[in-house]
Amino acid sequence: KKQCGVLEGLKVKSEWGRAYGSGHDREAFSQAIWRATFAQVPESRSLFKRVHGDDTSHPAFIAHAERVLGGLDIAISTLDQPATLKEELDHLQVQHEGRKIPDNYFDAFKTAILHVVAAQLGRCYDREAWDACIDHIEDGIKGHH
């Protein structure tokens, strides 16, 4: 299995910059990721009661979804800076600790990211690099790094 090395990190960082876009695009992008996640694991919505996870168009959920992608954005943009990335992943791990998020929810989120990014980028997309680097980020959030 491919590792998330410097080259993979730089590729993902560059492709993420193109896929993530800006402004209103980001809202649609984050909603697409969460809808794809909930389609795979509908029961995961219960983790988001406080932010109206039953309605991905609710302003509270949109704000939450964008905060999550903001964290992912920081993680991806520091893939080529291991010390900074570790700090960010440690911070995200603390935020997720105690929530007992099953691994299959992380898997569904990763699948959603890969799907939405691929749809956004078409052929200019290195699936193996994304696969390795999203695993690396999620392992850090789960505390397996």
Swiss-Prot record:
Superkingdom per UniProt: Eukaryota
Pfam families in the cross-refs: Globin (PF00042)
Listed CDD domains: Mb-like
Disulfide bonds: C4-C133
Keywords: Disulfide bond, Heme, Iron, Metal-binding, Oxygen transport, Transport
Gene3D superfamilies noted in UniProt: Globins
GO molecular function (one): oxygen binding
Binding site for heme b: H96
PROSITE patterns referenced in this protein's UniProt entry, alphabetically: GLOBIN (PS01033)
InterPro entries: Erythrocruorin (IPR002336), Globin (IPR000971), Globin-like_sf (IPR009050), Globin/Proto (IPR012292), Haemoglobin_extracell (IPR014610), Mb-like_M (IPR044399)
Record flagged with keyword Amino-acid biosynthesis: no
Keyword Metal-binding in annotation: yes
Stretches assigned to the Globin domain: 3-145
One Gene Ontology term, aspect cellular component: extracellular region
UniProt record similarity statement: Belongs to the globin family.
Quaternary structure and interacting proteins, as annotated: The extracellular hemoglobin of the earthworm consists of 12 subunits that have a hexagonal bilayer structure with a molecular weight near 3.8 million. Each one-twelfth subunit is composed primarily of disulfide linked trimers (chains A, B, and C) and monomers (chain D).
Name of the protein: Extracellular globin-2
Organism: Lumbricus terrestris (Common earthworm)
Lineage: Eukaryota, Metazoa, Spiralia, Lophotrochozoa, Annelida
